[in-house]
């Protein structure tokens, strides 16, 4: 190891200085690289990549296995930073840089994924991703970014305490799967052989803990049953591989059933590449940042750096976000822990993806290479960001028509969020052109505005209460802007409580005693327990806005004033605050059991507000096109290479706006089959959804909801994915007053998939 570090010191010393911007595209015209087949566009991407890898020395190969790949000055291969982020817009992270002012000093900052998830609008997801990838390519063309992006995060948001739940679309695996299909499709484009950018599905697998009870994500061993893997943790990742053909995956920090994810050949090879067929020549796996190192230093799965590097490479990791592969693969090779063939295969996958992206091709003839500053933060993008903020807003309470607000008058804006800007963005964000505060948004609408924060997000001081109560007494209506921000929830920071932090709730309830119309706008990715506010007659309305980002002020006030009608739905369950005392975060089981009351709407019944909840400024009547559908033949539904994607039927609803306000309506369709499959059975399962746009008062709209086989299946502990014949009940929305419908699947039990088990699966 000492010998390896000495001959590689010069490269390593420059390799890991934080990059300010990306290197230029390779010179395939006049430079030394132009003499190599990598620049020959008549060859296949795989052939071109293999030719480059074969031209590299062992030292050069090893020094291109980290995220800050050194390239080869000898060959004219520029350095490349693989670590680029674009969770909800081009983000200021490592491989991405922003100017201090002028061109490329900002990008469109869309609302956080949890807000986009609350919109339940697949077309909206794709359009957002398309704009993000356009801006990403513009940044790349100006040497401010790369052309691969480590997004999306599709770990289902199972535990309300998880600090990174804000990065996900929500808790339901079908919802996450549909999100990722559209988001990856929007980022990469429609041609898998020539992607717009490379997307990266993360974090494989069973990752939803930062630090809890003295256990951190770096050493946590997630004990997960085969049933929960197949029904909950893996479906979004399977969609990434099978349906979306994502370009890259990221393995997670945690171990899965005893094996660190980035050292788990079963997970990365047997499941991902072989069982799911994710074997494209340009498909690659990166470790999460520092995850390869932590195979040794936190999991103690191996004893040395070379062993950790070898374990990752041999498991199927192609790239290290960190230093362990470039630091230790040389010694691993000398010890016989890796083969040159395995190293070459990893690099070939990486460079094949760059060839497919046009990285080595002339700019002429590549429309994407002409994108520039004029294509960033366009008026269309800004309007779309506002649309997402509006469509993802969820109305949780509205008594006596507290909302929409009356025009004009005096508003008292109270709460810690009234003057926030970047705090509205969530994490993994880049600079936005402008983020108006709630105060600014209200003043633009012509209101007379009185302001007093009253308290801070997590403060127990009541020093500001008197000022808040004083302005409230002078106002026509009160709006409290509060909730949680990234000082309470974020990467590396899980919550220990899920009630309102600090004394925000105390202040809200004091305001509620004044007899003025009071609206509470709740920010944050995770939910807080609103029980006291829902029960208070003095709290007229509650609105969840999540992290609405650059258009948050305008979008929120469009909803508050009635310019836009709320129609978003909670993409996660709102649990009572006592829930955190009932189940440890380290318990990965979904089903109820000892010290576990059950997780998500499928298994938990005592929610404060359920998954899918959301009110409107109008009323709707919903009925089924018919009371019974089908029957459907089980064997027919089980046909094909990927039967889980087969369509069962398109179920039609008649949705009538019986109120006075035009409004969108999200039709959520659940199925229940309590007698079928292993017991206990889920309470219900989301099987489809569709968002209808602007249904006018008095209008009846036909809303079609397509249902595939996947959400109807159940898994067994021996790894079978099964479709059971029998009767299924369809439920719409979370309104028990809406009628149900039924359908029947006839025939024999069908095994759709035989999932390979590792031998380490949790019982």
From Swiss-Prot:
The keyword Zinc does not apply. Optimum temperature is 48 degrees Celsius. It catalyses: Hydrolysis of (1->4)-beta-D-xylans, to remove successive D-xylose residues from the non-reducing termini. It comes from the Eukaryota. Pathway: Glycan degradation; xylan degradation. Its EC number is 3.2.1.37. It is found in: Secreted. Optimum pH is 4.4. It holds the Pfam family Glyco_hydro_3_C. This is Exo-1,4-beta-xylosidase bxlB. It comes from Emericella nidulans (strain FGSC A4 / ATCC 38163 / CBS 112.46 / NRRL 194 / M139). The gene is bxlB.
